[in-house]
């Protein structure tokens, strides 16, 4: 079984007060300062949390490889032979002028101008173009508004007052894994997506050898929310027999083995970095191949039981 060295960084930046005062370039300098004493030429991955690069609209997908941020990242990665940086970021794509929205999730920014905004994960490497994946399980009211045309005139302003959104994030309809030049395949799973077992198995069926979960659990505060998300991560490890590297902005960042055991973590509301050798897996579990078969069998038995009781009721009647 192949093992690789992975570093997980927990920046612990308060999103309510501090995060949005810094540019993406300034946020990247924090990464360099915090990680330089921990990563080496043996480190294959440096993992950062969801939405770390979130300044302004985020990363312009049309010019991602020609940005100041990308140049700074390349300069950093060139110091390490095989290092890959996986990080969460807000990203966007602006479309040419059009009377009608070019996609179902496009938001109008001016007359005839449209933009899609994404909650994305990126992989930056020193020998490949950037790879990205857009979060596809969105949080209602925070990342998208259902029945937007109907509800926006009624509750739009009310929702904004409580930190929600009347905009809609873009998604993608397939699970994209990140591949390195050493053919290491990792699954980029963003926050809320980790609670869906069958959703995560799509990455594994597409070849993922390791699950990477990035999250920004600072919004929860010190409640049960961030602990529950961590518990879901352990289930995903067991179901797929894949180790997990989990980076959360304020915690709990952790390494989880394929049996669902937390082998190292950074406590909530702490700044830190942890480094471990983690095993890669290629075998597909029965659950990953066939999905939540127990629930389907239970549902079938329930339906048959209801039909049986209904039949007996009719006979007695």
Predicted regions and their residues:
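Enzyme catalytic cores with a strong preference for nitrogen-chemistry domains
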Residues: 1-317
């Amino acid at each position: 079984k192949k093992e690789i060295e992975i570093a997980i960084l927990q920046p612990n930046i308060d999103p309510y007060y501090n995060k949005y005062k810094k540019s993406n370039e300034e946020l990247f300098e924090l990464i360099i300062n915090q990680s330089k004493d921990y990563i080496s030429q043996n480190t294959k991955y440096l993992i950062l949390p969801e939405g770390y690069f979130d300044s302004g609209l985020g990363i312009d997908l049309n010019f991602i490889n020609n940005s100041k941020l990308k140049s700074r990242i390349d300069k950093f990665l060139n110091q390490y032979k095989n290092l890959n940086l996986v990080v969460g970021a807000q990203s966007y794509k602006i479309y040419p002028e059009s009377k009608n929205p070019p996609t179902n999730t496009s938001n109008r920014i001016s007359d005839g101008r449209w933009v899609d905004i994404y909650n994305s994960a990126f992989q930056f490497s020193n020998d490949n173009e950037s790879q990205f994946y857009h979060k596809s399980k969105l949080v209602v009211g925070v990342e998208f508004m259902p029945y937007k045309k109907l509800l926006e005139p009624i509750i739009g302003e009310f929702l904004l007052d409580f930190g929600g959104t009347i905009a809609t994030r873009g998604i993608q309809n397939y699970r994209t894994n990140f591949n390195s030049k050493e053919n290491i395949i990792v699954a980029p799973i963003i926050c809320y997506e980790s609670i869906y077992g069958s959703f995560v198995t799509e990455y594994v069926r597409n070849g993922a050898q390791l699950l990477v979960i990035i999250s920004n659990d600072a919004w929860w505060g010190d409640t049960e929310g961030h602990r529950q998300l961590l518990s879901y991560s352990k289930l995903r490890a067991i179901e797929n027999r894949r180790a997990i590297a989990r980076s959360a902005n304020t915690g709990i960042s952790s390494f989880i083995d394929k049996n669902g055991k937390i082998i190292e973590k950074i406590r909530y509301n702490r700044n830190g970095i942890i480094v471990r050798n983690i095993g890669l897996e290629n075998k597909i579990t029965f659950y990953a191949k066939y999905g939540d078969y127990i629930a389907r069998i239970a549902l079938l038995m329930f339906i048959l039981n209801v039909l049986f009781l209904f039949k007996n009721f009719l006979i007695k009647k």
